[in-house]
From Swiss-Prot:
<dbReference type="InterPro" id="IPR012128">
    <property type="entry name" value="Phycobilisome_asu/bsu"/>
</dbReference>
<keyword id="KW-0472">Membrane</keyword>
<feature type="binding site" description="covalent">
    <location>
        <position position="48"/>
    </location>
    <ligand>
        <name>(2R,3E)-phycoerythrobilin 1</name>
    </ligand>
</feature>
<keyword id="KW-0042">Antenna complex</keyword>
<feature type="binding site" description="covalent">
    <location>
        <position position="165"/>
    </location>
    <ligand>
        <name>(2R,3E)-phycoerythrobilin 3</name>
    </ligand>
</feature>
<comment type="function">
    <text>Light-harvesting photosynthetic bile pigment-protein from the phycobiliprotein complex.</text>
</comment>
<keyword id="KW-0793">Thylakoid</keyword>
<feature type="binding site" description="covalent">
    <location>
        <position position="80"/>
    </location>
    <ligand>
        <name>(2R,3E)-phycoerythrobilin 2</name>
    </ligand>
</feature>
<keyword id="KW-0813">Transport</keyword>
<keyword id="KW-0602">Photosynthesis</keyword>
<feature type="binding site" description="covalent">
    <location>
        <position position="59"/>
    </location>
    <ligand>
        <name>(2R,3E)-phycoerythrobilin 1</name>
    </ligand>
</feature>
<keyword id="KW-0488">Methylation</keyword>
<comment type="subunit">
    <text>Heterodimer of an alpha and a beta chain.</text>
</comment>
<keyword id="KW-0249">Electron transport</keyword>
<dbReference type="GO" id="GO:0031676">
    <property type="term" value="C:plasma membrane-derived thylakoid membrane"/>
</dbReference>
<dbReference type="GO" id="GO:0015979">
    <property type="term" value="P:photosynthesis"/>
</dbReference>
<dbReference type="InterPro" id="IPR009050">
    <property type="entry name" value="Globin-like_sf"/>
</dbReference>
Amino acid sequence: MLDAFSRAVVSADASTSTVSDIAALRAFVASGNRRLDAVNAIASNASCMVSDAVAGMICENQGLIQAGGNCYPNRRMAACLRDAEIVLRYVTYALLAGDASVLDDRCLNGLKETYAALGVPTTSTVRAVQIMKAQAAAHIQDTPSEARAGAKLRKMGTPVVEDRCASLVAEASSYFDRVISALS
């Protein structure tokens, strides 16, 4: 797993040069409080997000909770909730690090094959991830630290207020899209 700083150093080391991507590192540092706010917003609402996503998935496919369905009996429902929570947790890790490698290496590697072997319907799982993606975007947009603290407390390049979370929403969405691609 490489964060933005490690990636820049490894890249510079491989080319035997100095770290030249200072602008990208400066942007990463400047987004630090917003990034922490975004991760906190997702982590603080994780239980509700997971249960709502699984409930939404079940509402769209009632067969999942019927006898023989993948969310029946209770132990299968618990496994479904656990898996959704794990996916969400690794998305937050990736968002915090600014890098998808932790998500790829520790969560997505072999996930589709495992679900296929267990007979888990990936279309329903993809739908639950899509619901969590929409929820995460809503929670991230609702937690602007700059709006509460004021520009005088943020000296590292505060963005325009309307656009303060757009890049983090896009980044988080890209991580959810990676999960969806891995399952499809």
